Amino acid sequence: MKKKFSWGIPVLGTYVIYLVLVLLGFTRGLHGIGTAALFERNATLMTPMTYAFYGIPVVTVIGLVLMIGQLAPVRGAGERSYEGMQWMLLGSNIVSIIWILTWHFEKKIVAFIAMVLLLLFLSLAYMSALRYTLERRRATWMRMILGIWIGQTIFLTVESLSSVLRFAGMHTESNQLYGVLFLVLATLVTLLYTVGQREFLLGLVSGFYMFGVFMRHILVLRFNYVSVSIISLLMVGILVVSLIECVRKNLAKPKRCPKDRREEDTRKEDTRVEEKREAIQRVEEKPEVFQVKEEEDHVNPAQPS
């Protein structure tokens, strides 16, 4: 329990700080830019997602608490992957704080560097989580990670489609695309809640919200649609490949490594030795029973068939 507590406090604490800064940026602004003024200057931000963003702190904190709360103390197998994942989560939270502060104070270059580092940290965290799940197949919280991945993929797909159409000169409104997206999300929420996959549901919604903030605030406002299209499509490809690989490996029958085979052979040999020892002990405890049995076999030998 000590390892679990010591990891949970810094990871959750830094994430809460980041969420508070995001909420302040929405409501008051850290550089004299209020929420109303921000949306007045950027009419394309007025989508259904705008109102859903106010649920980010609650949904994401609940999801993170659930994910960390289900991580049992690790002993032996998977310990290195577990610690690596927690280091990456902690690093991504710290970078997120730097990113949101530099963006609000209009340090564009620093914010862009922090954005790239954030993607790197999160990618490494997901890779470590995947390795940990493959090593400890009872880690049910992996559904949370899969939900986050799928939530990001859904958002990036719609964002990429919108930016590509606009770059091609076609008139498109993000509101229409996000309207369809929210219908899809509403259907998934209803389905997942009905079948009881609440971990997966929280991961899906949290991933959609978190990456939605990232894309709309940094890429769309600070760069052009060409950059959005390239980065979004690249990320969609990476996430889809990661999901396919993750599902394939988790569904595949685990292969025994040479060390596992040696351990199994050792256990079988120990079992045979123990059975022989028990048989000898039974003979020593009741020798008369076995003596009578031998005499009967000598007097009445088995008839050949």
Q: Where in the sequence are the language-model features?
A:
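Alpha-helical transmembrane segments of multi-pass membrane proteins
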Residues: Y15-G32
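Central hydrophobic cores of alpha-helical transmembrane segments
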Residues: F200-V213
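Internal transmembrane alpha-helix with an interfacial aromatic "cap," most often the third helix
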Residues: V61-R138
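Membrane-interface helix caps and helix-loop-helix hairpins in membrane proteins
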Residues: W99-I113, R166-E173, T194-Q197, I218-N224
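N-terminal membrane topogenic signal
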Residues: M1-V11
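Membrane-interface capping segments at transmembrane-helix boundaries
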Residues: A72-P73, S128-T133, L243-K259
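Alpha-helical transmembrane segments in multipass membrane proteins, preferentially the mid-helix core
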Residues: L122-R131, T153-F167, L181-Q197
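Short aromatic-rich membrane-water interface segments that cap or initiate transmembrane helices
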Residues: E40-G55, T140-W149, M170-Q176
